[in-house]
Amino acid sequence: MGKPFIVGLHCWMRTHRVLGFSLVLVCWAVFALLAARMQPDSSSLAFFPDDAPQLHRMAKALDVSPASGLLFIDLYTERHGGKYALASAADAMVGDLPSDMAERVGAVGMPDARALMALLPYFTDEATLAHLQRATADAQIDTSVRATRDNLNSLLAAGPAQEWLRADPLGLRQHVLSRLPVEHAGAMPDPVLGYPVSADGKHLLLVLRPAHSLHDVSAAARLMDAVHASMQKHLAPDMQGLVVGGHRHSAVNAQVIQRDVTNIVFFSMLGFVLVYALLVRSRGVLWLMLVPAFAASFALGGMTLLSPVLSGLALGFGASVLGVAEDYAVHMHFALRSGQSTENVLEHITPPLFQGYLVNASGFAVLLLSGIPAVRQLAMFALLTLSAGFALAVIVLPVCPWFNTPPLPVHKQNTEPRQPAPLRVFACVSGLLLLCYALFSIVRVDVSPRTMGAGMAQLQKDGEKLKAVWGSRDSNILVVECKTTTEALANGRAVADALRRLEPDNKLGTLTDVWPSQEQAQANVQRWQAFTRAEGPRVRALLASAAQRYGFTAEVFAPFTQLLESPVADFDPAALRAAGLGEMVDVFLHAPTADDPTARLLLFTSAQTDVSQLEPALAAQTTALAPGELETTLLQQLNMEKRLVPLAWLACLALLFLYFRDVRRTLLASLPPLCSVACILAWMSLTGHPLTLAGMAAMPLVLGLAADHGIVVTHDLVSGVKMGVERAVVVSSLTTFTGMGLLALAQHPALKAMGEVIFWGLIVEVPVALWLLPKLCRVEGKQA
């Protein structure tokens, strides 16, 4: 950027100040209105790579997985007979929850006896028909009725058992129940209470189906607030509640972040006030404080022109770049207070500031090549923020009132130009590079999404407690995805048949066992009808005779005899819900919705399955969800993004060399960011802290400030002209520390990691820029 252009633009702004400010305010208003269109996306899907559709399918499938898509609440009491009180509390909690937040998952077991037996005709395959013929033999009917009498005279006849014995005197229900994948669908509920109760009667399980995705962080937080409020209201002092589920993970993150930000904002604002009051001492601080707000408005407004939906997590990480945008304004402020004319200041300070802007922008520009949408959004936000901050600093702020007052105290300054001492600089850079290489081989890099979560240890502990009482639901799940539920069921049957043939030892639970195809149902019904036409009258007569012989009325087995007489309609899925299997259907089959047009059918397997062994057409529509599979696949994709780091470094070094056109000066200016990296890696190696995604997100701020300071200080040393650079470096570093470095005190792992990286990066960067760089230079003409 040429000096005459900036000086000429400044002269125009100074001459047409009213018009210039009006244009700036109009532009700001337009971009602020555009920013109001922004729709923050709290979903984590933006961090899944574009070229990994399998990851997106896994993430969406997690929403329908029982282990993550449901919310499990374990209610516990030591009270004798306390299960009844727990059931009353659970009913009250369900009544308190708004229907648009969650609904209770009802009883999966204890289906209706008559309606369940009505499914038998649809399941009468060859094996069932053979058993049916054996069970209806004359002698076997007599034996079965006698056993029924014995059961009715025992304690087994209490409650629903009577209905089962009347509806199925011949013990045929096993051919229906054996098809139910109840071991995968959920815990069996108590027939009286309607909730699953542990064997000791001390635990009761309430299962909720949230109305929103677990990726919707704000909705998950509202749901958990409502659940905890309801538990506090309805649980007696001797009762305890334990909540486990993916929505709790999301809510804990949101709540911890909100608490951290609330606690740290006060100290950050206090730090800003102290820094400005002690080191700036100017009414121009008002303009400095407005720079981040202006830059953020321009950046957000510009991004909404590309897409109104922006990742909240990406913008949260990108907000750290606001500190670099303010850095330009701080340097301009102290340079203007040096006592020289504005034109001289602009000619002197604009080139290094512009070079610092280009160096930072080049690093973020490389990130635009990322395959992760959130990283590209972060890069674009950073580019727009840096551009707005630089433009404000060199064009608008120099003509703002009070911005250049009061003059700085005049100190004796060495204005003799200096040049880097080659041996000293090369020795320092070589040593730092070797140190960074050695430390990086020691530091553990952990880009796991788990490092972004709060309270993971407690959440895992609570999950183990739930498993100890109710067993594990960490099944291996296959998700068959199609456009319609009909296609999903058809492909699910094909997948189930193939797996039973390829992996006979892999236990499979699938809805297709109780939801036969139209052809299967018709063939089975034909067998049933042929049997009832031929044997029905005989069976009814033998049952009536045996009933009277053993002391029953002739109509005691009317539910079963009516089944033999009644015509059988075509199979209708409503028959499953009539039998009390609706919740099981909802667990396994998920119809398309307005938000997600994909139908999904779940198949549960006892062992991990390799879907690649299926036919290509089936394998393409089937996703395997083994425990930890999503995280493993995501880590593989994120590791591929590491290639962008050396590219960003090379881009920054190339621009530095193009600016200084001298290897010695380029290496000298690169010392502050190198020292920052070395200090961060040294701290991590000594403490055992890994380099996480959040730490990587904070790196651009530290390296951006360090690069800016290295360029500006090197420029001043080489030119011999100083315009308040030392104070500008200290102020910009301290404001960044108070604004972002205090995040090291946060409880959320991601925020804490960001704060620690910024803290240790800035600790060493300031003394290196202000003390070490001058020591590595010598006055021209003198020997090192």
Language model region names:
Residues 305-306, 321-337, 350, 354-412, ...:
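Transmembrane alpha-helices and their membrane-interface boundaries in multi-pass membrane transporters
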Residues 34-79, 183-193, 422-424, 441-483, ...:
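Solvent-exposed, non-transmembrane loop/terminal regulatory segments of multi-pass membrane proteins
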Residues 2-42, 394-448, 461:
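Signature of alpha-helical transmembrane segments and their immediate interfacial
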Residues 85-204, 505-585:
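Alpha-helical transmembrane helix bundles of large polytopic membrane transport and channel proteins
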Residues 424-545:
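Juxtamembrane segments of multi-pass membrane proteins
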Residues 160-277, 282, 562-657:
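Extracytoplasmic
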Residues 285-331, 665-713, 741, 771:
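Hydrophobic transmembrane alpha-helices and their membrane-interface caps
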Residues 289, 340-370, 718-747, 766:
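Pore- and gate-forming transmembrane helices of large, multi-pass membrane proteins
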